[in-house]
Swiss-Prot record:
Domain of life: Eukaryota
Protein role: This protein plays a role in synthesis of starch. It catalyzes the synthesis of the activated glycosyl donor, ADP-glucose from Glc-1-P and ATP.
The protein, known as: Glucose-1-phosphate adenylyltransferase large subunit 3, chloroplastic/amyloplastic
GO biological process, one term: glycogen biosynthetic process
Organism lineage: Eukaryota, Viridiplantae, Streptophyta, Embryophyta, Tracheophyta
Gene (UniProt): AGPS3
Record's keyword annotation contains Chloroplast: yes
Organism: Solanum tuberosum (Potato)
InterPro entries per record: ADP-Glc_PPase (IPR011831), ADP_Glu_pyroP_CS (IPR005836), NTP_transferase_dom (IPR005835), Nucleotide-diphossugar_trans (IPR029044), Trimer_LpxA-like_sf (IPR011004)
């Protein structure tokens, strides 16, 4: 692909001057530009999209894991944090303009973002950016309040979309920071643009057994959202049944899954529409899902986008526990081991795991751990974990540690009757979440044999949530304890 530019001889005052350059070979710049434009139109231009990841509220349903951290900073899958999921989806989709809104317990989240997604040591973003926007107060009565909801949080930073850096932005992705799923956001945006929608909502087809647990949408034969119903039951539920073949399901699948649920806080807005809704149409609305979007169906074109794949809201201790253990299934419904669409996280430069005479069954074992003559069954073991001799770990999610203790420190603590990091010998643990830097002594039994569902035993270093024992971060469980 190229043109020859020929320089003809020319005459100046009867003197014939030969040019120094007789021929130049160049690329067909105009042709290449057209090809690039066609490719962007075909796939959707990621350069005109900005993503906003919501840091979430106080995370009370995930307490005590959110006692000292924001929901998106909660560790997941042995080596990741929940924020890595939407961040990686953005990277894999080619979207490199990202804002992250934070408010509660944001120190560890901010630190992780700085380490994992900066321009020097982590994932690079070329001409894009990743910026953490902490809750702040601004002049005016409304600006004196902290974030009151998803829409209020975005409204506080509406000026970003009027900034010169955002002049080419056409669409805004609104994303949650505490979901587990893998999505091509660019395909989502492309569908939004091709449909002519003002707002597009990511939706999940579901069957009768789960429909009452979700907010459902009623759509017409073009996929336009006509109405919403929050967790309907009985006749109200039956009234929300729709023909899901409209969104692309086969007739067989549509018969099994006749309901459309919003997966929550995964939206795409036209930028101008978003600004209009936040500043002028609904200036006091605090939430997208319960206020702005339902009200917008009457005036704007709101459409549903089919996402027929694994998705989990990590909003409770039970869902967090279940989603982690589901990673150990064969095959898992969600896997971090996808070479074409990897999940990124911070670089830790940890050594390989050291496993001595241990048995590991249906489990995930992260890097930098030490296992000695133990049995790990259907569990997730996080980074830098240390598990001692004759320990049996079953149905347990161990988040790992932030640092190592040296052999000398461990010997010194044992000599003084203290408990080192990790799990001591002859301990049995079942149905448990062990937060970071926990110290569990020798001959401990954690099994909730009495079936306690809820209990605050923070003075003893643990909680009971939905029947699951949660060992608090930095806590110590003494030798011989039975829970």
């Amino acid at each position: 692909m190229g043109k020859k530019l020929k320089y003809t001889k020319f005459q100046l005052r009867s003197n014939v001057v030969k040019p120094n350059i007789c021929m130049s070979l160049t690329t067909d710049i105009a042709g290449e530009a057209k090809l690039k434009d066609l490719e962007r139109q075909k796939k959707g231009d990621a350069r005109t999209v900005v993503a906003i990841i919501l840091g979430g509220g106080a995370g009370t349903r995930l307490f005590p894991l959110t006692k000292r951290r924001a929901k998106p900073a909660v560790p997941m899958g042995g080596a990741y944090r929940l924020i890595d999921v939407p961040m990686s989806n953005c990277i894999n989709s080619g979207i490199n303009k990202v804002y992250i809104l934070t408010q509660f317990n944001s120190a560890s989240l901010n630190r992780h973002i700085a380490r994992a997604y900066n321009f020097g040591n982590g994932v690079t973003f070329e001409s894009g950016y990743v910026e953490v926007l902490a809750a702040t107060q601004t002049p005016g009565e409304l600006g004196k309040r902290w974030f009151q909801g998803t829409a209020h949080a975005v409204r506080q930073f509406h000026w970003l979309f009027e900034d010169a850096r955002s002049k080419d932005i056409e669409d805004v992705l609104i994303l949650s920071g505490d979901h587990l799923y893998r999505m091509d956001y660019l395909h989502f945006v492309q569908s939004h643009r091709q449909s002519g929608a003002d707002i597009t909502i990511s939706s999940l087809p579901i069957d009768d057994s789960r429909a009452s647990d979700f907010g459902l949408m009623k759509i017409d034969d073009t996929g336009r959202v006509m109405s919403f119903s929050e967790k309907p039951k009985g006749d109200d539920l039956k009234a929300m049944a729709v023909d899901t073949t409209v969104l692309g399901l086969s007739p067989e699948e549509a018969k099994e899954k006749p309901y459309i649920a919003s997966i929550g806080k995964v939206y795409v807005f036209k930028k101008d529409i978003l600004l209009n809704l936040l500043r002028w149409r609904f200036p006091t609305a605090n939430d997208f899902g319960s206020e702005i979007i339902p009200a917008s169906t009457k005036e704007f074109c709101v459409k549903a986008y089919l996402f027929n794949d694994y998705w989990e809201d990590i909003g409770t201790i039970r869902s967090f526990f279940r989603a982690n253990l589901a990673l150990t299934e064969h095959p898992p419904r969600f896997s971090f081991y996808d070479a074409t669409k990897p999940i990124y996280t911070s670089r830790r430069n940890l050594p390989p795991s050291a496993i001595d005479n241990s048995k590991i069954v249906d489990s995930i074992v992260s890097h930098g751990i030490f296992l000695t003559n133990c049995f790990v069954e259907h569990s997730v073991v996080g980074i830098r974990s240390r598990i001692g001799t004759n320990v049996h770990l079953k149905d347990t999610v161990m988040l790992g540690a932030d640092y190592y203790e040296t052999d000398a420190e461990i010997r010194s603590q044992l000599a003084e009757g203290k408990v080192p990091l990790g799990i001591g010998e002859n301990t049995r643990i079942k149905d448990c979440i062990i937060d970071k830097n926990a110290r569990i002594g020798k001959n401990v039994v954690i099994a909730n044999s009495e079936g306690v569902q809820e209990a605050d035993r923070s003075s003893e270093g643990f909680y009971m949530a939905s029947g699951i024992t949660v060992i608090s971060k930095n806590s110590t469980i003494p030798d011989g304890t039975v829970i």
